Structure formats: structure tokens, C-alpha cells
Amino acid sequence: MMGCLPTKQVGRSTHSLNPREAVALAAETSFTVNEVEALYDLFRKLSNSIIKDGLIHKEEFHLALFRNKKTNLFVDRVFDLFDQKGNGVIEFDEFVRSLSVFHPDAPEEQKAGFAFKLYDLRQTGFIERHELKEMVLALLDESDLNITSDAVEMIVDRTFDQADTKGDERIDQEEWNEFVKNNPYVLRNMTLPYLKDLTMVFPSFVIHSEVSEADMVA
């Protein structure tokens, strides 16, 4: 159904990135202008892998992350958080802003906030026990780990024992921030090291960049 959307209204009609947009996105994220341009090249490939309309649909997102189109709660949640406008697709500016959270230089508070929203499935402002369990099961489903249901319950119980300091059977943002501060391993998947070397992954952008880094100062 998404493929039936009129691409004139939401898609991109050109194959080049507006230099002003590159500068603006670099100014509000952890990326340089050259890296934003490299991300645009990646975005174009992903957004035309199945439905050729210059937008990343959920099927394309699944394929990019896990090389399959299998439905999974974890992938769905990440997609929903990338889709900041809530229109069922990921546009380029959303792609850059969301990926910036995973940049090695992004503040830990941003990473913690994104992870909190990931687990807050019902978007109530709290992580409840059943939500944490659902997400743990979804993560295990995408991994090669074979863990018993008792072990899953143990993970959930241990997390709540440490994080739910108010003892109300739910974890709020403040409790979560303190929990990840004491358990930094929780956020280890929130950093993608290669995002710091995008111009090495796409070296042509260093040479052919349409915007110089000096323009960032203006």
C-alpha cells in the first residue's frame, strides 16, 4: 500500500542533496557535511531497494538491517523511532537525525533517551515489566542465542531490581538514566563505530563534496 503513495508529494525528485540541507543537518547532528553527503548516497540505495520512491519503507528497513523481511518487534520499534513524522516512511532528514544518536560522539543522554523510547512500547513514559520482556524476546529472536524462559524472567527481574528504585513496578526516564549510567553495557549497541568513518567508507565524497566544511562556520 505504501508503494501507492504519490511520490511527487513525499519523495525526492532529484538525485543530489541540497547543499543548504547538508549544512543544516550537519549543524544539528554529530555528522560533518561530508558525512551527511555520504549518508545521502546510502539513503538513496536503501530507499530504492524495493519501492523506488526515494523513501525508506518498513520492508526496506528490515532488509537493510537483517537481510530479510521477517516481521520483528525490535525492528518495528527502531523503524517507528526513525519515522519521526509518523507517516509510515523514513525521509532523509529523519534518517540522518536518528542515525546521529548512534554516532560515537553523540551524548550518552541521547543514546539513553532513544533506548528508553525503544523499550517504552506503549509510549506511556514508563517501561513496564511486560514491555521489557517483549523487547528482550524480540532481541533474542534476532540473535543466535538460545535462552530459556526462566533466564529471560531472570533478566527482567534483575533489571527491575536495579532500575526500579521507586518500587512502583515501572521504570521512568530518570530511573533509566541512572540505571544505564551504572550499567554502561546496556547502551553498547547504541554506538556504531563506522559512523565516525563515513568518508572512508564513501571516500568519493571527500573529493566531490558540494559543500566545504568552511561553510559550516558561516
Curated annotation (Swiss-Prot):
Q: Which UniProt keywords apply?
A: Repeat
Coiled-coil spans in chain: none
Inducing factors? By salt, drought and cold stresses, and abscisic acid (ABA).
One annotated GO molecular function is: calcium ion binding
Question: Which is a GO BP term held by this UniProt record?
Answer: calcium-mediated signaling
Tissue specificity, please? Expressed at low levels in roots, shoots, culms, leaves and young spikelets.
Q: Which SUPFAM superfamilies match?
A: EF-hand
Q: Please list the residue ranges annotated as the EF-hand domain.
A: 35-69, 70-105, 107-142, 151-186
Site, as annotated: Involved in dimerization? 143
Q: Which SMART domains match?
A: EFh
What InterPro entries does the record tag this protein with? CNBL1-10 (IPR045198), EF-hand-dom_pair (IPR011992), EF_hand_dom (IPR002048)
> Which domain of life does the protein's organism represent?
Eukaryota
Q: What does this protein do?
A: Acts as a calcium sensor. CBL proteins interact with CIPK serine-threonine protein kinases. Binding of a CBL protein to the regulatory NAF domain of a CIPK protein lead to the activation of the kinase in a calcium-dependent manner.
- Subunit text: Homodimer.
Family membership noted in the UniProt record:
Belongs to the calcineurin regulatory subunit family.
Q: What is the name listed in the Swiss-Prot or TrEMBL entry for this protein?
A: Calcineurin B-like protein 5
